[in-house]
Amino acid sequence: MRLYALSVSLLAAITLLACVIASADSNMVSQMKRRLSQDVSETEITELSESKKPTAQDIDNEERAQLTLLSDSQAIVAVAEKAAHSSPKVLGGTSALATTKFALQSQKTSRLRQLLDKVMKISGLLKKFLNFFKNKKTNTVPKLENKPHNAFDTV
């Protein structure tokens, strides 16, 4: 009976540990997303404030002048190339930094997931162990009650 009580309390502790690990995992992922978005937005703000870029109207006028010189197919290629070259400039050096941070966080997350898997396996084994004790306890031969074997006593 003591072994049964010990295994029940151990199962409860492991289940609690699994819940803590799962909540830590989800909290870490949400914090990681917030940090990455803050890092990117702060870097974008500093890059935009440091570099003096022409206004949107100047860019539009320049693009219109260039596009009138090109044919339609060349214009499409030029716009695609400009878009491909402008996106890394917006993120700047933070894309590599964000990728590195994400990789480090995902390693921690994968370690937590592996730990959670191990805890769940142990929990499953303990549940099987407890079920074995329950079945062993209920599979005992029932005690015979002293009943009179009289046909008139059936109710």
From Swiss-Prot:
A motif (RxLR-dEER) lies at residues 34-64. Its main location: secreted. Belongs to the RxLR effector family. It comes from the Eukaryota. It is found in: Secreted; Host cell membrane. Has the canonical translocation RxLR motif, but lacks the canonical EER motif, which characterizes most oomycete effectors identified so far. Keywords: Host cell membrane, Host membrane, Membrane, Secreted, Signal, Virulence. This is Secreted RxLR effector protein RXLR-C301. Transmembrane segments: none annotated. One of its GO terms (cellular component) is extracellular region. Induction: Expression is up-regulated during the early plant infection stages. Secreted effector that does not suppress pattern-triggered immunity (PTI) in plant host. Residues 1-24 form the signal peptide.
